[in-house]
Amino acid sequence: MAALMRVKDSSRCLLLLAAVLMVESSQLGSSRAKLNSIKSSLGGETPAQSANRSAGMNQGLAFGGSKKGKSLGQAYPCSSDKECEVGRYCHSPHQGSSACMLCRRKKKRCHRDGMCCPGTRCNNGICIPVTESILTPHIPALDGTRHRDRNHGHYSNHDLGWQNLGRPHSKMPHIKGHEGDPCLRSSDCIDGFCCARHFWTKICKPVLHQGEVCTKQRKKGSHGLEIFQRCDCAKGLSCKVWKDATYSSKARLHVCQKI
């Protein structure tokens, strides 16, 4: 009988101890809830937001034992991208609460710029570097849709810009030079003029007509030795010795005469 009484007493003590522990745990839970509500009221959060935040923290503690658990533990509730730290964005699924997730890297799918990591932006549903997104609009599309010049029917240089990448830009419409204008070749001058040397430069000079003094070129390429170079005689004329010149003259005079 004494042993039976001892067993009953020990079971009663255990039941009493369990009841005390349950009461203390319930009181501790209520005090934590009150503390969270006080913090949320001071921080300007609504009760729903504080509940979501506590749920997210509990979820992180539950998965804290694995590597995946660590990433889930950092997914804090949010309402916009501004509430997340750098390198994260506010993910809003169709079902479930919003949470801060890791940003999307280059060539990953996206719906907005905020989803992409710093230095990239969302373009056509894919995260691309900012430099590429800036340059892309300036490169014409390679779809062959080019407009013709209404006046001449040719493709304009602007439409063919993607073909001219890396090539020097075409010159502006060339304006022919008049007498005294600088030049590089005779084609730079208007009709009736040639490009001739004048001191250390070349300028447009008039082509010689009949009776005008000319320079007889004895050797090919001797124009380069002249400081004041003359143009050649006009078409149908030739640079010949003047017949009335005196034979005693060492430097015989040449003029443009008919062939």
Curated annotation (Swiss-Prot):
Classification via Pfam families: Dickkopf_N, DIKK1-2-4_C-subdom1, DIKK1-2-4_C-subdom2
GO molecular function: co-receptor binding
GO CC annotations on file: extracellular region; extracellular space
Keywords: Developmental protein, Disulfide bond, Glycoprotein, Secreted, Signal, Wnt signaling pathway
Cellular location(s): Secreted
Cysteine-cysteine disulfides: 183-195, 189-204, 194-231, 214-239, 233-256
Principal location class: secreted
Database matches in InterPro entries: Dickkopf_N (IPR006796), DIKK1/2/4_C-subdom1 (IPR048500), DIKK1/2/4_C-subdom2 (IPR048499), DKK1-4 (IPR039863), Dkk2_Cys1 (IPR047303), Dkk2_Cys2 (IPR047302)
PANTHER family: DICKKOPF-RELATED PROTEIN 2 (PTHR12113:SF12), DICKKOPF3-LIKE 3 (PTHR12113)
Family: Belongs to the dickkopf family.
Protein name according to UniProt: Dickkopf-related protein 2
Phylogenetic placement of the source organism: Eukaryota, Metazoa, Chordata, Craniata, Vertebrata
Gene (name only): Dkk2
